[in-house]
Regions:
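Canonical Radical SAM [4Fe-4S] cluster-binding loop centered on the CxxxCxxC motif
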Residues: 1-17
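Flexible, glycine- and charge-enriched loops at secondary-structure boundaries
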Residues: 12-19, 102, 106, 174-178
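Conserved AdoMet/S-adenosylmethionine-binding subsite of the radical SAM
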Residues: 21-35, 44-169
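Short, charge-patterned binding micro-sites
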Residues: 41
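Short, basic/aromatic-enriched C-terminal tail that caps enzymatic domains
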Residues: 167-182
Length: 182
């Protein structure tokens, strides 16, 4: 499969930064920074995300989140604390397992996508395309499904094969394979 942050798999704690240290750095940057974006891996995996978002908001910062939407119940709880979300939508619902290798992952991701749109917060849906996984038919199905859901902001980005976990995909050239025009 593909992951933008393969260095975070498996999840490591050896280089963890104390939350107090993060807050101290942000205190020093008040007036210089507008927002704090929680990224990952998958930030909604972290039980401390909700209180962290609240603390950041209480400091006066806007908040952002990068997510693949795999935990809709957790996402629903934090959406009121989010100003913007970058949402990695990998495929149309019926094609999700092909991309993720995880059964029912499409149901969860698309439920989260629906929650994002219904919330009214600013968002960007994005899909990383590797031509051997997501062909033009699958990409078109994905774009249509997003449109039917009400999505208006969608970005297609080319896969950086150095982040592929699958050795065959890692050695496949995507240089001359721009995503198809929809």
């Amino acid at each position: 499969g593909y992951c933008q942050n393969t260095e975070l798999l498996p999840r490591k704690t050896g280089n963890a930064i104390a939350w107090k240290s993060v807050i101290e750095k942000l205190e020093k940057r008040r007036g210089l920074l507008d927002a704090v974006v929680f990224s990952g891996g998958e930030p909604t995996l972290q039980p401390a995300l909700l209180p962290a978002l609240q603390e950041i908001r209480d400091m006066g910062f806007k908040t952002g989140l990068h997510s693949a939407g795999m935990y809709p119940a957790r996402l629903k709880k934090i959406l009121p604390l989010i100003d913007w979300i970058g949402f990695d939508i990998k495929a149309a619902k019926q094609d999700y397992e092909i991309i993720t290798g995880v059964k029912n992952s499409g149901e969860k991701a698309w439920e989260s996508a629906r929650l994002v749109i219904q919330s009214g917060i600013d968002y960007e849906f994005r899909t990383t395309v590797h031509p051997h996984i997501l062909n033009s038919e699958r990409l078109t199905a994905l774009a249509r499904e997003l449109s039917a859901l009400g999505a208006r902001k969608y970005v297609i980005q080319k896969c950086n094969t150095s982040h592929c976990l699958d050795a065959e995909l890692k050695t496949t050239s995507v240089e001359n394979s721009a995503p198809p025009v929809l």
